[in-house]
Amino acid sequence: MRVKGGTVSRARRKKMVKLAKGYRGQRRINFKVAKQQVWKSYLYAYRDRKNTKRNFRKLWIARINAAARMNGLSYSKLMHGLTLAGVELNRKMLAEIAVTDFDTFAKLADQAKAALASDNVLVQERVAATLETTVKVDR
């Protein structure tokens, strides 16, 4: 006896229309349109999972920058100073500290300033040494 695929087809269509729950108009009712919209929704979801990560990183950087400027540093100088000081906090944690505990953030900024100051001294010494060697070579 020949078996037609009515039950399987109905189940497949029903599953797709169920995924379209909450959509408006034909996108919720009509299988063909619902299927297209569900596929499009999957694409949006994939894209926006990536965008969420970007958006949070931008938000953290904006918060850190605002707090850093209150302490007399730019974002880039703060991050470079923290790297020189050996502070290994990620942007998410730094942003959380900046929002919730400003005193601790000020201490971190002071550490960054101290590390930048000592690094500037080393750079100036290296520049002076380079200039001395070039003057000796020219003579």
UniProtKB/Swiss-Prot annotation:
SUPFAM superfamilies: Ribosomal protein L20. One of its GO terms (cellular component) is ribosome. It holds the Pfam family Ribosomal_L20. PROSITE patterns: RIBOSOMAL_L20. One of its GO terms (biological process) is ribosomal large subunit assembly. GO terms for molecular function: rRNA binding; structural constituent of ribosome. Keywords: Ribonucleoprotein, Ribosomal protein, RNA-binding, rRNA-binding. Binds directly to 23S ribosomal RNA and is necessary for the in vitro assembly process of the 50S ribosomal subunit. It is not involved in the protein synthesizing functions of that subunit. PANTHER family: 39S RIBOSOMAL PROTEIN L20. Belongs to the bacterial ribosomal protein bL20 family. This is Large ribosomal subunit protein bL20. It comes from Leuconostoc citreum (strain KM20).
